[in-house]
């Protein structure tokens, strides 16, 4: 009987600890995705540095150039930050950046703004509905959609660099 009570007490304690961990998870979500945006920032800025002078290169007709991909990332960061903070996007497409230094600065600024928006979300904010690309989704869904897309563009940018004989800075 004593053994059963001890085991029961251990189970109750374990469940109580798990409940507190589950309740703490959402804040970890914001921190983890803020960190992911920071990692993407470093990698895209690094690629923009080593691909300077090759921004117009593209593997073929009808696909984005190196610079087009970087400009898209900046635009996506702005769209997502606006969606997460409730700011209304004017819909005006910014002029394409072609200068390597300005590109690096714009990438850095766009990711800093995005990280601030992500880490500023409350747990309840994650479930707030927003419209992104004409679709209704939660802020958490919008965050996942854009960051997944950016990881694909990171792979694309790495392939573009390697096709030009350029090694990504973190691979050296």
Predicted segments with their positions:
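Boundary of Sec targeting at the N-terminus
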Residues: 23-25
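Bacterial N-terminal signal peptides
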Residues: 9-20
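A composition/secondary-structure signal for short, hydrophobic, low-basic-content segments
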Residues: 3, 19-21, 149-152
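Acidic/histidine-rich alpha-helical segments that form the ligand environment
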Residues: 44, 98-131, 137-152
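Terminal, regulation- and interaction-focused segments at domain boundaries
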Residues: 28-32, 102
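Short, solvent-exposed loop/beta-turn-alpha elements that line the ligand-binding surface or hinge
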Residues: 95
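Positively charged n-region of N-terminal signal peptides that target proteins for export
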Residues: 1-7
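Short, contiguous alpha-helical
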Residues: 34-48, 54-92, 131-172
């Amino acid at each position: 009987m004593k053994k059963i009570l001890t085991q029961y007490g251990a189970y109750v304690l374990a469940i109580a600890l798990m409940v507190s961990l589950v309740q703490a998870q959402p804040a970890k979500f914001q921190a983890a995705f803020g960190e992911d945006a920071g990692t993407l920032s470093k990698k895209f800025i690094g690629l923009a540095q080593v691909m300077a002078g090759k921004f117009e290169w593209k593997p073929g007709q009808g696909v984005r150039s190196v610079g087009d991909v970087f400009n898209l990332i900046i635009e996506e960061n702005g769209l997502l930050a606006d969606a997460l903070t409730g700011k209304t996007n004017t819909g005006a497409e910014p002029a394409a950046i072609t200068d390597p230094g300005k590109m690096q600065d714009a990438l850095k600024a766009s990711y800093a703004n995005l990280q601030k928006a992500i880490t500023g979300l409350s747990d309840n904010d994650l479930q707030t509905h927003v419209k992104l690309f004409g679709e209704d989704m939660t802020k958490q869904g919008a965050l996942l959609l854009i960051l997944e897309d950016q990881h694909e563009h990171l792979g694309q940018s790495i392939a573009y660099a390697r096709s030009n004989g350029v090694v990504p800075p973190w691979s050296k």
